[in-house]
Amino acid sequence: MTDRLVPASLALRDDGTLVSPEFGDLHLGASGALAHRVFVAGNGLPTRWQDRRTFTIVATGFGAGGSFLAAWAAWRDDPARCERLHFVAVEPHPFSRDDLRRAATHIVADTTISADVEALADAWPMLVPGLHRLEFDEGRVVLTLAFGESIDMLGKIVARADAFCLDGLASSSDADLQSTDVVRALSKIAGEHATFAVHASSDALKHALGKSGFTYREVDDLLVGEYAPRWRARRHEPPLALPVATRRAIVIGAGLAGCAVVERLAARGWEVTLIERHDRIASDASGNPAGVFHPLMTRDDNVASRLTRGGFLHAIARWRALENAGHAFARSTNGMIHLAESADDFERMRDAFDAFGPPSDYVSLLDIEAARAHLNLSVAQGGLLFPHGGAVWPAGLCAAQYAAAGERVRLLASTRVAKLERRGDAWHALDDAGGTLAEAPVVVLANAGDAARLAGLQHVALQPVRGQLTLLPPGSTAPLPCPTIGDGYAVPLDDGTLLIGATFEPDDVDPAMRAAGHLENLERVRHLLPGLIGDLPDPDTLRGRVAFRWVVGDRLPLLGPLADEAGAIANARALSGAQARDLPRLPGLYGAFGFGSRGLVWAALGAELIASQLEGEPWPLERELADAVDPARFLIRALRARRVGRAG
């Protein structure tokens, strides 16, 4: 169960200074000049990041963002700066957007910090637990905020830190942040000779640092040092970039998953060959007229809830970035309602809502009367209103991502990959005659059900599910103000057509349209929204579309590096208690498939995860969630159960 997020508030003292009443002055963080002296100069910056591809700073607090703004300004002012600056900050009590703007403006006033406070405030995420990734300066400065309790979140971050900003660790009033557990967590993500700096210090902090492998020294009123343990190497080292001679990749599959990967790799300077078996991108399920887009909510905030929340929020941020860069696409912006299927279902929704305590910009609970008023239609139950949920035209999104990649992507359409073969340091995508279609050190399989065949995976549980949707002509239904889901869905399209659906037919691979499928969709939506459809139309006269979704047994996607199954099976005894990090991997082979009906929610986050893994950057997912979507998870279960050698 995820703890509720308790935001900090901001108040004005009689003397005109700002303070957080609950957490005091220290929650604001260092002011601009102090932040620069402590966290920038104290970590040997800008010299240490110069001429590097990436540099990662991890902060034990964020407050009003003084340390981040100081680092951003120093990076901007340095002509020899690293190509990409990552700043990861844990914050148990974030400010609201308005309070953040006021506090940040307050602490940077009359300093030389030139970073744009408004840009930070404009990008500020919804106040819900988890990781939030924000990009600035065309994606070259990346802020990852970890909202949640410090010890908990530090243990979930996957990164290789080059420098630490120990915000809050010097305060004797903050026993939590002074604990050995926090500093030990920092030691697990510290890169070789990672430095730290803190203004003032306590004996407890010095003891914790020394015990966890950090050396330190006092310089004036600063405590500075580096990670230099005397003991042997750690069992699990922080992630490094994949060593490749050239930054080239092949992406197989040009749907939501593949186009998202293409855009994220191209944004980092990779040259990508995109291979699609159809004559255009977004031709299979990604070619549907629209798809609904929303997170899940459960009382226990389980893995699926946290993963869909992270994917939902990350996708919103990425889509806005695409639109701001001139790559707009069709999507609804007036929210989405998830209606309960029964009274018991509504009580489950209420329990989840009350347990999570979300802000209204994330979700609101609607009783029957409120849902009826919002939709102007009769409803059987209340539900949840997601103001930023809605419907997206998947093909338009794919086209926008493809356009954003620009000249860094080359499309091979109407091309089938018969086989993948590793030759030396490169993968070769081969046609039916054995000829090379493309070669690169990295391949990302984003081709749904065909991915397991190409990778030769035996321990991946994929199942095809037939989905038929129905299109009702303009004027044939009552007006619907926003997409609505429950047992089925109804989506108003721009031309007045109403999209309803969809059937869910496991292991059915018949591509033909069926009148029975239309009738099933009509009956389901009549139950969902009794006043939406009058007399049932003749199903034989209706238009629609059939597409196939590929789902995984646990209903989670497959994202990340693919396992070397043969190598793992050969070493099965030693790996019977393995974690995901212990398994051998096929060099440079990654997967982004098994999205089921949640491609819109998971594709952007999955692409960012894979790009971050390739580049050795901080991951946009917590370790537990990354393990939950690891393509090797079924192999791990088979190894633990000693069932290797047959599909698991």
Curated annotation (Swiss-Prot):
One of its GO terms (molecular function) is oxidoreductase activity, acting on the CH-NH group of donors. Keywords: Cytoplasm, FAD, Flavoprotein, Methyltransferase, Multifunctional enzyme, Oxidoreductase, S-adenosyl-L-methionine, Transferase, tRNA processing. This is tRNA 5-methylaminomethyl-2-thiouridine biosynthesis bifunctional protein MnmC. Pfam families: DAO, Methyltransf_30. The gene is mnmC. The lineage of its organism: Bacteria, Pseudomonadati, Pseudomonadota, Betaproteobacteria, Burkholderiales. GO terms for biological process: methylation; tRNA wobble base modification. Its EC number is 2.1.1.61, 1.5.-.-. The keyword Flavoprotein applies.
